[in-house]
Amino acid sequence: MSRVPAFLSAAEVEEHLRSSSLLIPPLETALANFSSGPEGGVMQPVRTVVPVTKHRGYLGVMPAYSAAEDALTTKLVTFYEDRGITSVVPSHQATVLLFEPSNGTLLAVMDGNVITAKRTAAVSAIATKFLKPPSSEVLCILGAGVQAYSHYEIFTEQFSFKEVRIWNRTKENAEKFADTVQGEVRVCSSVQEAVAGADVIITVTLATEPILFGEWVKPGAHINAVGASRPDWRELDDELMKEAVLYVDSQEAALKESGDVLLSGAEIFAELGEVIKGVKPAHCEKTTVFKSLGMAVEDTVAAKLIYDSWSSGK
């Protein structure tokens, strides 16, 4: 008789993954393994996207196997536009399925929203560690949703910024963010005000047209571009994309899914995993962009860590 899979709620996932910083070492390894090709032991196709045009949404399916963890997962993620600030349904919803890789048995069904938020922020922190200017004092976050909170949490754990700024299209949400998080955050009235002189910029918006322009960005700054996950969506303008040194999580995915890359015609310099491995340089003296689309193996790493923690405490 097959055993019933574990069902882990968002609260339980949070309990077993209290700090995003726990993900940094295994994610660095996973990114390096992914960029090593088949010998790296990561089997991961580009996500499959099923448009739900009638309702302005889509379903994404993200499977991966990682030999290092001997872990097999699939994430199901939905995105629906224009939920609005009064909606009780978030724009993104996700569920992660963890399987026993030796026989395919379903081990666990996990809330994927916490996993997505924390692993994405951890990967941005890894990119920033390698690509930020040597003396980085000002952090700017564009957007005030779930990813803004997860990025703020790990960035204030991992780095020492003297000033943190935030901008959001709806200023009330930026003010709520500043009132909610620990530490002082300056709320800015415009993107230009927020990014002026910033050393590290994080874009976590629902923008479909550019909101960040190269002429506003300090030379030598590092940008983590996290939003705009579809081929016709953008957060960054042509000037910034073409003048910066461009790093991505997956070159294959970026050339299929990233509007920031496709519509600007920018040339990809390296995958982040190649920088971690030391086969491509980190040009921290230049303006850099890390285009993060998110990869299934990142969910695999997080899900295995959570499941192992849950299993040990049963």
UniProtKB/Swiss-Prot annotation:
Record-listed 3,3',5-triiodo-L-thyronine binding positions: 47, 257
Positions bound to NADPH: 82, 92, 119, 144, 146-147, 168-170, 173, 205-206, 226, 228, 292
Predominant location category: cytoplasm
EC category: oxidoreductase
Record Gene3D superfamilies: NAD(P)-binding Rossmann-like Domain, ornithine cyclodeaminase, domain 1
GO MF terms, alphabetically ordered: NADP binding; protein homodimerization activity; thiomorpholine-carboxylate dehydrogenase activity; thyroid hormone binding; transcription corepressor activity
Activity-pH dependence: Optimum pH is 4.5 for the reduction of 3,4-dehydro-thiomorpholine-3-carboxylate at 37 degrees Celsius with NADH as cosubstrate.
Alphabetized UniProt keyword annotations: Cytoplasm, Deafness, Disease variant, NAD, NADP, Non-syndromic deafness, Oxidoreductase
GO cellular component terms given for this protein: cytoplasm; cytosol; extracellular exosome; mitochondrion; nucleus; peroxisomal matrix
Tissue: Expressed in neural tissues, muscle and kidney. Expressed in the inner ear.
Annotated compartments: Cytoplasm
Protein's UniProt keywords contain DNA damage: no
Modulation of this protein's activity: Inhibited by thyroid hormones triiodothyronine (T3) and thyroxine (T4).
Entry EC number(s): 1.5.1.25, 1.5.1.1
Domain of life: Eukaryota
InterPro entries: NAD(P)-bd_dom_sf, ODC_Mu_crystall, ODC_N
A Pfam cross-reference name: OCD_Mu_crystall
Gene Ontology biological process terms in this record: lysine catabolic process; negative regulation of transcription by RNA polymerase II; sensory perception of sound; thyroid hormone metabolic process; thyroid hormone transport
Catalytic activity: L-pipecolate + NADP(+) = Delta(1)-piperideine-2-carboxylate + NADPH + H(+); L-pipecolate + NAD(+) = Delta(1)-piperideine-2-carboxylate + NADH + H(+); L-proline + NADP(+) = 1-pyrroline-2-carboxylate + NADPH + H(+); L-proline + NAD(+) = 1-pyrroline-2-carboxylate + NADH + H(+)
Function in brief: Catalyzes the NAD(P)H-dependent reduction of imine double bonds of a number of cyclic ketimine substrates, including sulfur-containing cyclic ketimines. Under physiological conditions, it efficiently catalyzes delta(1)-piperideine-2-carboxylate (P2C) and delta(1)-pyrroline-2-carboxylate (Pyr2C) reduction, suggesting a central role in lysine and glutamate metabolism. Additional substrates are delta(2)-thiazoline-2-carboxylate (T2C), 3,4-dehydrothiomorpholine-3-carboxylate (AECK), and (R)-lanthionine ketimine (LK) that is reduced at very low rate compared to other substrates.
Family: Belongs to the ornithine cyclodeaminase/mu-crystallin family.
Associated disease: Deafness, autosomal dominant, 40: A form of non-syndromic sensorineural hearing loss. Sensorineural deafness results from damage to the neural receptors of the inner ear, the nerve pathways to the brain, or the area of the brain that receives sound information.
Subunit structure, as described in the record: Homodimer. Binds the thyroid hormone triiodothyronine (T3); T3 binding inhibits enzymatic activity.
Name used for this protein in its record: Ketimine reductase mu-crystallin
Lineage: Eukaryota, Metazoa, Chordata, Craniata, Vertebrata
